[in-house]
Curated annotation (Swiss-Prot):
GO terms for molecular function: ADP-specific phosphofructokinase activity; magnesium ion binding; phosphofructokinase activity. Catalyzes the phosphorylation of fructose 6-phosphate to fructose 1,6-bisphosphate using ADP as the phosphate donor. As a phosphoryl group donor, ADP can be replaced by GDP, ATP, and GTP to a limited extent. The active site is at D436 (proton acceptor). It is an enzyme of class 2 (transferase). It comes from Pyrococcus furiosus (strain ATCC 43587 / DSM 3638 / JCM 8422 / Vc1). Pfam families: ADP_PFK_GK. Homotetramer. GO terms for biological process: fructose metabolic process; glycolytic process. Its EC number is 2.7.1.146. SUPFAM superfamilies: Ribokinase-like. Belongs to the carbohydrate kinase PfkC family. This is ADP-specific phosphofructokinase. It is found in: Cytoplasm. Keywords: Cytoplasm, Glycolysis, Kinase, Magnesium, Metal-binding, Transferase.
Amino acid sequence: MIDEVRELGIYTAYNANVDAIVNLNAEIIQRLIEEFGPDKIKRRLEEYPREINEPLDFVARLVHALKTGKPMAVPLVNEELHQWFDKTFKYDTERIGGQAGIIANILVGLKVKKVIAYTPFLPKRLAELFKEGILYPVVEEDKLVLKPIQSAYREGDPLKVNRIFEFRKGTRFKLGDEVIEVPHSGRFIVSSRFESISRIETKDELRKFLPEIGEMVDGAILSGYQGIRLQYSDGKDANYYLRRAKEDIRLLKKNKDIKIHVEFASIQDRRLRKKVVNNIFPMVDSVGMDEAEIAYILSVLGYSDLADRIFMYNRIEDAILGGMIILDELNFEILQVHTIYYLMYITHRDNPLSEEELMRSLDFGTILAATRASLGDINDPRDVKVGMSVPYNERSEYIKLRFEEAKRKLRLKEYKVVIVPTRLVPNPVSTVGLGDTISTGTFLSYLSLLRRHQ
């Protein structure tokens, strides 16, 4: 499978950012408390800021996360705080974040034949985190040119940095007279949410070359629609950017009917979620999501009872039923679902791949994820041997049993539904981007297996 996958060309867009990681210790935490004062922090904690406008908002929410030991994410809405964070903290590591960024680096790690990555903003700090071998499309003298992404950066482009503060169980610090011990390990994420970086689009000068890019590749993986806003200060809105997103898809397919996969991510705003789902899904061939995202989508399609059942009981039969509804209502080719214990495909009976081939495709996805979890990254196609040696998770027999029961209960005559247990690494080096890794592996293997039927 790996050799066939490497023969493919893939285009990926739109979202990439810098993940800057700080490993917190008692000294760093105490320094922050002394700088702002325990009384001010306690008062701000009582107000419980839901976004970060100034440093005190950050310190108060960080202390709350440390006291509870719960992972949390709070949006940073003041762009001027970039400088304060960069002066205050020494980052232990910086790595690529955002689905399109992570996926591009996975593709080039597998030595896929051609990897073209596009993000509307490419500042130098971001460009340097992409791996060697990734191409970025630019327009020079009214011609399309593919440049190494590291040299294609633009001075002055806005930067999206998500700052991840890792904390460890047992860390002790003082907040005034109160001694606090962190009860659980976790992370506190400060996610950048500025208007300047929320315009998910292909720039006008490049857009007319999308049919040419489509001819160069076998498939495209698109993501980042969750970054769109309902309204913008210049009068534009979500509808404007979704119209442009649909035009991008049409243009990519104009000269060559390439397969397009959308990697969905949770969208908290119900109105925006409905707009993205109804506008984008019917335009593409493949969609990837987890079971919670199935429930979120069902709720905006009018199936709130089934959505509630998925949230409450997490049963395979409900996930299958929900997946079939999404596939039919939004009329695309194949749905890929990734959960901690299993991966699933739902497609129509006339799909050219057999159920055995679909299972092989899913298995390739879980092999890639196990490889990344074991090694922290994928830098060579031979790395996948590590993932192949990871056994299926301990619930795999139970999952197969539940799946057989679900098949007896549901009417599946018009569908092909297959499930493969995941390969779980007991002590993963990294868990970041595992869903993106699964979707990359399943989509690549799906494309390569379809080629056999052409």
